[in-house]
Structure formats: C-alpha cells, structure tokens
Design a protein with these regions (language model features):
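Surface-exposed beta-strand/loop patches in extracellular or lumenal glycoproteins
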Residues: 73-95, 172-176, 183-191, 439
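Short, hydrophobic/aromatic-enriched beta-strand segments in well-ordered soluble domains
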Residues: 74-78, 127-141, 184-192, 214-220
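Zinc-dependent metallopeptidase catalytic helix centered on the HExxH motif
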Residues: 179, 301-368
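Glycine/proline-rich low-complexity spacer/linker segments in large multi-domain proteins
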Residues: 125, 135-184
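A surface-exposed beta-strand-loop module
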Residues: 91-153
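Amphipathic alpha-helical substructures
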Residues: 358, 397-471
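N-terminal, polar/Ser/Thr-rich
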Residues: 2, 17, 22, 26-71, ...
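Hydrophobic helix-coil surface modules that form long, contiguous segments used
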Residues: 177-316, 345
C-alpha cells in the first residue's frame, strides 16, 4: 500500500493561543487519544472513523473533464465525542496538499484510504471543530466486493459519482460510514455548457469566464454514501409536486424514453406519503445518466440516479428509499435489509394498490418459486437470512431484497393491516433523519403490537437459515 507522510514543524506558543480561541478545545490541559480508524462495521471495518461526528460538509470543487482533474477544498464541521489527539478521515487516492484544524496547520499522514490528522493541540470532548483539506487529482473508480463499480465513474460527456457503500471517499474526505449523517453544501465549477447536479436544492448557477459554478444545499442529514454528483450535458426539468420543488436531469439520449415515467414522480410521492407518512426532505427529482460500468440505480438522497430510462417499478423502489434508507438509514451495512426489504415491499404495495397482484399473492409466488424464471433464481433468496449476509459481497444479494420484503409481509400477517401500516408510518417517523438497526426494528414492532407472538417471524424469516417449512 502506498504511503505518504507530511509533517509540519511545531508552531510557536502564540499559535496555540489562536488555536484555543478558534476551537475552544486545543491545549488547555486536554490530554486526548487518537479517534481511530473504522467503526467496527462487520463488512467494511475501515469505513468511517471513531471519536467524532460530522455535522456539516462544505465542498468546493472544480472539475476539468478533458484533463480528468478534480481540485477540491473540503471543510468539515464536527463534534468531538472524546478528547482527541488525532482523528482519521477516509480519502482514497488524490493528492492532499494542505490540512488545517481551526485555521491552524495540522500534521497529517496517509496509509491507504486513511488520512490521519493531528491538530496542533488536543480537542476536548463535545467541542466543535473545523477541519479543512485541500486536495486534487484524478478520482478513482472503486470496485465493490460484489464486483460492481462506484466512486468516480466516467460518462460520455463527464462523470457520475456514486457512493454505495464506500465510493464517496474517492472524491471527498469524510467520515464515510452510514452511521454518521450530516448536512451538505456543495459548490462545483465546470466548463460552460455542462451541468453539475447534486442532492438537495440548487441555490445558484453563475457563469463567468468560460466556467459555470453550481451551488447545491442539502439541509437534512445525509449519509455520505447517498451523496452524488453528475457532471455532463443534461435536459433539465424544474417543476413541483404540490409545494415540493422537483429537479430532474436526464441524459438527452434518454430523455424521450424517460419522460413518461419521470412525469409520474408527483403521483408516486403522493401515494408514498399515504403509505409511509410525510415526505422527509425539502426537494425531490431524479438523475438519468449512463456510465458504461454501472448497471444499477441508486437511491441518492432527494434525487435517485438511474442508469437509463426507469420503469415504474424501479421508480417506486428508489423513491421509497427516501423514507427507508435515506431518512431512516442503517446503523451498519449488516442492516441493509431495512433499506432493500422495505423498498422491495413498496413495489408489492404499489402493485396491490394499482390493480395488480396483492402483496400476499406476490409473497406466495415468491415462496413457491413461480415468480422466477429459473429454479436457480428461486433458490437464491434462501441462501442466507436477510439480517445476516455472510460477507460484504452479499449485502445487495436477493435475500436482502426479496426475503427482506417477505419478513414485512409476515409481520403484516401477524399484526393485521391497520396495525401494520401504522407500523410502516411510525417507523419512518420515529427514526426520521436518523439511524436504526435490526434490533431497533424488531423492538419497535413488538412495542406497537403488544401481545402478538412474533418469535417465529424473527427466528424463521429474519434470522433463520434456509427456507421456512410453511409460507
């Protein structure tokens, strides 16, 4: 693994005083310890970092598609969760040029994806501090354990940045684990004629001297894997769903095919609000952009990304994630079924509410194998329990999606429709803009359905190995 080290000489005592004034935490008798790399995620042990919580990312980027060169300044505002002598950020590749903490030059070194920062003085527990990283280079494409690609992905006329599960570290430094959510402000400068599309609301768009700067704001907390950036030529559509602003950006080659389905975003949002509760964000929309190496859609917050014109099933799935996955975000990657099982069940509910098969019929056909084209596909969903994928390469496999949805149908069978739909809405409301794990979900359901025996649902469908004997 390539290593680089940058050591900065010790600053004079006057700088210590300046640091104390800026941080309200440096020196002053604080004796911290390093925050550490990783947060002990069972599948991505190096993802995220200990000792602090990021509350805001301020990213200022400039991208030259011809040279494939990105220049960035990242300003992270964070709160120390312990006394810190050092802390880590996740950043893959790129050349780090300068790091400051509270405006004071900090020492730093790199090893793989870990950028270790040593502020001039220790940071006290509960103190708010600001770290600024200047960096540049050609961001990398990341290959997942399952073979899919993410990170910084080239398109015909620009790039597409996708982050699930760890790709965002390819284009900005951060605490890249779903358990740390933050607000974002992103300013991106690109050659005139190109658009830069991200999450949240477009605050401004200014062109000068052959370049255009787009400024995006995401006020609601967002896990970094849900951050996106699409640079290229797009057909832009601005509209509203009631009071909610919609912004869609579509590759011109996909515009005609995408228009009929994307035009139904307001309808899907209205239906979703009836089923899942109030929409959790202040804007919505979609991005349709094609990177040759990407064959999947992703629920990037407020603005899902589709690799081509979506159908209704895919649109319903990705918009359902705005409640389940984006607003209620998994505590760790082991809890992915709370994303994908819920979004898959949303597909079943959409069919049920729009003249198609009921969710119970869909469940029965999945259980019998009738809904699959091959016997192999029918057997795949029983390879492991949805709440316990065997490894990082399986967190997006069929059991997480389909068997995860089956768990919800079993809960519905056990508690009845009225209580079940109350649980769906209440779960989204209780953990709105937060994190939750599987134990939180089972406890929540049991609290909402006192006296209901759910042991078999959890033991056989959620955690059990193999195919349960009875549907």
């Amino acid at each position: 693994v390539a290593r680089s080290v940058r050591l900065v000489p010790t600053l004079p005592a006057a700088s210590l005083l300046a640091c104390a004034l800026v941080l309200s935490a440096c020196g002053g008798g604080v004796h911290g310890t390093p925050g550490g790399s990783g947060v002990r995620d069972p599948y991505f042990p190096k993802a995220g970092n200990g000792g602090y919580d990021v509350t805001h990312y301020g990213l200022r980027l400039a991208y030259d598609p011809g040279a494939r060169h990105l220049t960035g300044t990242a300003v992270l505002t964070a709160r120390a969760e312990k006394d810190l002598s050092a802390f880590n950020l996740d950043l893959l590749g790129m050349e780090v040029e300068k790091v400051t903490v509270g405006g004071e030059i900090a020492r730093w070194n790199r090893a793989g994806q870990e950028l270790t920062v040593r502020p001039h003085g220790d940071i006290g527990r509960d103190a708010t501090f600001r770290v600024t990283v200047r960096y540049s280079g050609t961001p990398e494409t990341v290959t997942d354990p399952d073979g899919s690609q993410e990170g910084w992905l080239r398109t015909a006329d620009g790039v597409l940045a996708l982050g699930e599960p760890t790709g965002s570290m390819a284009w900005f430094p951060g605490n890249h684990h779903p358990s740390d959510k933050a607000a974002y402000d992103l300013a991106v400068t690109v050659p005139e004629g190109l658009h830069a599309v991200s999450n949240g609301e477009l605050r401004s768009e200014r062109t000068a001297r052959g370049s255009t700067t787009f400024v995006w704001h995401s006020g609601e907390p967002m896990a970094s894997y849900l951050a996106t950036l699409a640079i290229g030529r797009f057909d832009i559509s601005r509209s509203r769903a009631g009071d909610l602003p919609l912004y869609t950006a579509v590759d011109p080659a996909e515009a005609a095919a995408s228009r009929p389905v994307l035009g139904r975003i307001p309808e899907v949002l209205r239906w979703s609000e009836r089923r899942f509760g109030p929409y959790p964000f202040s804007s919505a929309g979609a991005i349709v952009d094609s990177a040759a190496s990407v064959g999947y859609a992703l629920e990037t917050q407020t603005r899902p990304v589709f690799p081509g014109a979506p159908d209704m099933t895919l649109l319903v799935h990705e918009l359902a994630h705005q409640w389940y996955g984006d607003s209620v975000t998994p505590e760790s990657w082991r809890d992915m079924w709370l994303n994908e099982g819920f979004a898959t069940y949303a597909e079943w509910l959409w069919e049920e509410d729009h003249g198609g098969a009921g969710a119970q019929k869909t469940f029965d056909e999945v259980y019998s194998g009738a809904s699959f084209d091959t016997e192999e596909a029918a057997e795949e969903i029983w390879e492991f329990p949805p709440a316990d994928p065997p490894g990082a390469g399986q967190i997006s496999d069929p059991p997480v999606y389909v068997r995860g949805a089956m768990v919800l149908q079993k809960v519905r069978q056990a508690v009845g429709d009225d209580r079940f739909f109350s649980i769906l809405r209440g779960w989204a409301a209780t953990y709105r803009h937060g994190n939750a794990d599987t134990a939180d979900f089972t406890a929540y359901v049991e609290k909402q359905a006192p006296g209901t025996d759910l042991e078999a649902v959890w033991d056989e469908w959620l955690y059990g190995e193999g195919k349960p004997e009875q549907p």
